[in-house]
Curated annotation (Swiss-Prot):
Its EC number is 2.9.1.3. It is an enzyme of class 2 (transferase). NCBIfam families: PRK11784.1-2, PRK11784.1-3, tRNA_sel_U_synt. One of its GO terms (biological process) is tRNA wobble uridine modification. The gene is selU. InterPro entries: Rhodanese-like_dom, Rhodanese-like_dom_sf, SelU. This is tRNA 2-selenouridine synthase. Monomer.
Length: 371
């Protein structure tokens, strides 16, 4: 039999298959990419066993667990674990701390003729490892921020770099008031775990300098890890510039045409277009206080007219009206103020091609220094 695993580095670098014995409610709060949840107990069973443990102690709780997961139910779950083990002979199982639940499942599998190793320390140990991974990267690596006005194409530039930490990608959110996607954001712990694994894999490839977008602490509903965010308040900044008309077209592409297509892909044609329109109206409503009554009313009317025309004919051209107004009257003044406050940290400014080449050259220089 393969030994139980203590090499968390290899687990995440090699995307080793793992099955999670925790209850669904635990799994939903936070897990690891690609892991399959095959719980020993469902949420209700876990709650009953937990209550019994508090009131009567461990022995009674274990007895209740065996009583609840017995007969056909036990056989059904055992078959699912066995199927995973046979499909992934190089994998592992784990529970919260690598304790009783892991041991029970290992024992039942052994009775069925399958010896399958566990992750020592379970979920908690792997989670701690990833938190440490993020903090070590913050302390040991070089970081540079990419900033710029809304619509300059920061994401487009980032996608052309090998050393990017895509906060918005990991958060499944574009970071602005209109940044929600057609699919849900990850749980906070999933966001943090995904970010840490991304850093771990890139560092294993020899990357010691990371580029990330100049974001606030909150990206939609996801919070940037504190150590990283504190560093972002002092990291050097590269500023991306582009013509106003180009920015309008890029926003039209990303936040209207492509986002509507996302909703249609997820929800179907009719519901997708309707839900897209509702999302856009809600996004505008979310900044009502910051816009002020008169400006909100005017831009909302332009948005409403554009959505009506888009839903009627598919023509998105009217969206340029509210996009231009929102940039000139809201986003650009806000970003101009922020740029002024960070002016001393800006080490380069240019268009998309210039910024991309500068960042690539910067990474090459850092790599030579590390060597």
């Amino acid at each position: 039999m393969r030994p139980d695993c203590t090499d968390f580095n290899t687990l995440f670098l090699d995307d080793v298959p793992m099955m999670d014995m925790r209850a669904p409610i635990e799994f939903t709060k936070g897990a690891f990419p690609g892991v399959v949840n095959l719980p020993l107990m469902n949420d209700q069973e876990r709650q009953k066993v937990g209550t019994c443990f508090k009131q009567q102690g461990q022995s009674a709780a274990i007895a209740l667990g065996h009583q609840l997961v017995n007969g056909a139910l036990k056989q059904q779950r055992l078959e699912a674990w066995a199927a995973f083990a046979q499909a992934h002979p190089d994998g592992y199982l784990y529970c919260f701390r690598g304790g009783l639940r892991s041991q029970i499942v290992q024992g039942w599998l052994k009775e069925a003729g399958i010896q399958y190793p566990k992750v020592v320390g379970g979920y908690k140990a792997m989670r701690t490892f990833l938190l440490d991974t993020t903090q070590q990267a913050v302390e040991q690596c070089d970081f540079v921020l990419l900033g710029g006005l809304t619509g300059t194409g920061k994401t487009d530039v980032l996608q052309q770099l090998d050393n990017v930490l895509d906060l918005e990608g990991h958060a499944n959110h574009r970071g602005s008031s209109f940044g929600k996607r057609a699919t849900a954001q990850p749980a906070q712990i999933d966001f943090e775990n995904g970010l840490a694994i991304d850093m771990l894999k890139k560092r294993a490839r020899g990357i010691g300098q990371f580029v990330l977008e100049d974001e606030g602490r909150i990206v939609g509903s996801c919070t940037v890890p504190l150590g990283l965010y504190q560093g972002m308040q002092r990291y050097p900044l590269v500023w991306l510039e582009d013509a106003f008309d180009n920015r309008v077209e890029r926003i039209l592409r990303d936040y209207v045409t492509n986002l509507c297509a996302e909703f249609v892909a997820v929800h179907g044609e009719e519901d997708g277009r309707r839900l897209f329109a509702e999302r856009m109206r809600q996004s505008m409503a979310n900044i009502y206080k910051r816009l002020g009554g008169e400006r909100f009313q005017r831009l909302s009317e332009l948005l409403g007219q554009a959505l009506d025309e888009q839903l009627r004919s598919g023509d998105v051209s009217l969206h340029r009206g509210w996009i231009e107004g929102l940039l000139k009257e809201y986003y650009d003044p806000m970003y101009a103020y922020q740029r002024e406050a960070k002016a001393g940290r800006i080490e380069f400014a240019g268009d998309g091609v210039e910024v991309r080449e500068y960042l690539k050259a910067r990474a090459r220089r850092q790599h030579r220094v590390d060597l």
